[in-house]
Amino acid sequence: MEDDEDIRSQGSDSPDPSSSPPAGRITVTVASAGPPSYSLTPPGNSSQKDPDALALALLPIQASGGGNNSSGRPTGGGGREDCWSEAATAVLIDAWGERYLELSRGNLKQKHWKEVAEIVSSREDYGKIPKTDIQCKNRIDTVKKKYKQEKVRIANGGGRSRWVFFDKLDRLIGSTAKIPTATSGVSGPVGGLHKIPMGIPMGSRSNLYHQQAKAATPPFNNLDRLIGATARVSAASFGGSGGGGGGGSVNVPMGIPMSSRSAPFGQQGRTLPQQGRTLPQQQQQGMMVKRCSESKRWRFRKRNASDSDSESEAAMSDDSGDSLPPPPLSKRMKTEEKKKQDGDGVGNKWRELTRAIMRFGEAYEQTENAKLQQVVEMEKERMKFLKELELQRMQFFVKTQLEISQLKQQHGRRMGNTSNDHHHSRKNNINAIVNNNNDLGNN
C-alpha cells in the first residue's frame, strides 16, 4: 500500500492500471446475468456459435483519454478518492514544514494538522473530497518512510535521488537542515548559544555546542577569574628583539603594589634578552598568575606583620623608590588598635545580645508567674463569693419557711374564733325567739 501511494505521488508517469488504462487499449463494459462461457473457436465462426459476441460488438467503446467512468464522474487521472497527487503532496509538505519549523522541529498537534488539512483542501485546482487531518498525518508518515528509503539507497551507492520531494524533505528533516545563527553579539559566557534543532544527529549537535561555547567564552575569562583583575600582557613585553632591559609595554593589574609591579618585570626584561628567546604565551600567563599570587600573599603578610618596629622597617626597606611612602608607625598602631576594638566591639555586641535575651526571658518568667498568681487569687475570690451566696440563699429559704408556717397558724386560730362566735350568736338568737314566744303566750 505504501509503495503504491509513493508511486502515485511521483506524478502521472505511472498511473494505476486498474483505474485508467493506458492509451491504445479499448475498455469494454459488459452487463450480463451471469459469467459467459467462452470457447476457443475460429474467428470466422465466433458470431454463429457464441450469441454474446454480437452484444460485445454492439456495445459502446470507451477510450482512456480522461473521459467519464461508469458512475458518470470524471476520472481525473486517479481511481481512489483518497489518493494523493503530486501537487497536493507538495502543498501538504509546505504547510507541514512551516509548522514543523515554528515548533522547533517538534511534533504537530491536532489543531496544526487540521490547519494543514484546510490548506491542502483549499487549493484552487482541488476537486475531490476534502482531506482530513488523519489523512494528512498518514501521508506525511508515508513520505517520511519514502525519504528514509531514498537515504538508504543513496548510502548504498545508488546515486542521487530522482524523487521530486527528496530535496525538500532533506532540508526539513535531513542532516543538511539549516541551523538558525546568532543575530546578536555575545552577551555573556554562554549568551551566544542557541537552541540546536533536534533533527541534527547527536554528534553534530555536540560538536556545534562545543564550538559555540569556545566562541562565546572570552580568551582571558579564566585568567580574570583566577587573579581577580584584567591581566592582558602584550607579547612585545617579552619580545626577543635583543634590545635593552624591559622593552615593550605591559598592562599590569592595578591591584598589585607598585614595588611588585616595577621589580619583577624589570628583572624579566633584563634576563630574557640575555637568554635570547621568548617564552610561550601559556608560560607567560602562568608566570603572571604566580607573580600576582605572590604579590597578594606579600600584601596580606605585610598587613599582619606589624608585631615589632624592626619587622616594619625591614618591610619598608623592601619597597622601591617609585612606590608611595608607607604610613607612619603611630597611624598603623592606631589602625591595629581600632581593629582590635572593632573585634572587641563585635564580641561586646554578642554579649549584649545574650544579656538582652536573658533579661527578656526573666521578664517573661516574672510576667507568667504574676499571671498565675492572679488566676489563683481570682479563683479563691470566686469560691468565697459562691459560698457566701449559697449561705444567704439557705438563710432566705429558712426564713421564708418560718414565715409561711406562722401565717398558717394565725389563719387557723382566726378560723376557730369565727366559728365560736357564730355558734354563740345563733344560740342567743334561738333564746331570744323562745323568749319572745313565751311572752306572746303569756299575753
Curated annotation (Swiss-Prot):
Top-rank taxon: Eukaryota
GO molecular function, one term: transcription cis-regulatory region binding
Motif Bipartite nuclear localization signal, residue range(s) on this chain: 290-303
Gene Ontology BP annotations: embryo development ending in seed dormancy; regulation of DNA-templated transcription; seed maturation
GO cellular component labels: nucleus
Keywords, sorted A to Z: Coiled coil, DNA-binding, Nucleus, Repressor, Transcription, Transcription regulation
UniProt region (Disordered), positions on chain: 1-82, 238-350, 413-443
Disruption of the gene: reported phenotype: No visible phenotype under normal growth conditions.
Residue stretches of biased makeup (Gly residues): 64-78, 239-249
Domain Myb-like: from-to ranges: 84-144
Listed Basic and acidic residues bias regions: 333-350
Chief subcellular location: nucleus
InterPro entries: ASIL1/2-like (IPR044823), Myb_DNA-bind_4 (IPR044822)
Subcellular location: Nucleus
Keyword presence, DNA-binding: yes
Residue spans of biased composition, Low complexity class: 271-286, 428-443
Comp. bias regions, Polar residues: 38-48
Pfam families listed in its UniProt record: Myb_DNA-bind_4
Residues forming coiled coils: 360-414
Role summary: Transcription regulator that may repress the maturation program during early embryogenesis.
Protein name: Trihelix transcription factor ASIL2
Gene that specifies this protein: ASIL2
